[in-house]
Amino acid sequence: MKVRLLSIGKDRSGLYEPAVQEYAKRLGHYTRFELVEMAEASGKRLKPGDAKAAEAEAILSKRKPQDWLVALDERGSLLDSVELSRYVGKAQTGAKDLLFIIGGDEGLDARVRDAANLTLSLSKMTLPHRLARVVLIEQLYRAFTILKGEPYHK
């Protein structure tokens, strides 16, 4: 099984990158993990909503037939860590790869949410997209430790 995180934009501040790298390294002990950073759609000629539409096309073009698509969106389901671990476990037994999507500043286009097998919210609070990466990767690491019965999750 492979876990990919497709995220629009880069962490230009460098603030979150050390945590992303640390949890990605830990996650790598359990599964193949890949972070794919995609460019934000931009330009002076873009109308409101056009960036989301352009990003949606780029995102959906990266989906493979074996992927279970999980879109992160404020309207999504709130899962606790154990529930997320069960979802990851189902993907493992179904021989599916997981593709998590974090949209750009405007969020995700409806086409991405509609294509998703699961729409997931990390919190009722609004999080910066770069911080959402850290939270998600840590929760994925936690999910695998739960599945393995390891003591990280308390």
From Swiss-Prot:
InterPro entries found in the cross-reference section: Alpha/beta_knot_MTases (IPR029028), RlmH-like (IPR003742), tRNA_m1G_MTases_N (IPR029026)
GO function term, MF aspect, one: rRNA (pseudouridine-N3-)-methyltransferase activity
Residue sites binding S-adenosyl-L-methionine per the record: L72, G103, L122, S123, K124, M125, T126, L127
Pfam families named in the record: SPOUT_MTase (PF02590)
Keywords linked to the UniProt accession: Cytoplasm, Methyltransferase, rRNA processing, S-adenosyl-L-methionine, Transferase
One Gene Ontology cellular component annotation held by this UniProt entry: cytoplasm
UniProt EC number: 2.1.1.177
Top EC category: transferase
Swiss-Prot/TrEMBL catalytic activity: pseudouridine(1915) in 23S rRNA + S-adenosyl-L-methionine = N(3)-methylpseudouridine(1915) in 23S rRNA + S-adenosyl-L-homocysteine + H(+)
Role played: Specifically methylates the pseudouridine at position 1915 (m3Psi1915) in 23S rRNA.
Subunit structure as annotated in this protein's UniProt entry: Homodimer.
Family that this chain belongs to: Belongs to the RNA methyltransferase RlmH family.
Name of the protein described by the UniProt record: Ribosomal RNA large subunit methyltransferase H
Species per Swiss-Prot/TrEMBL record: Myxococcus xanthus (strain DK1622)
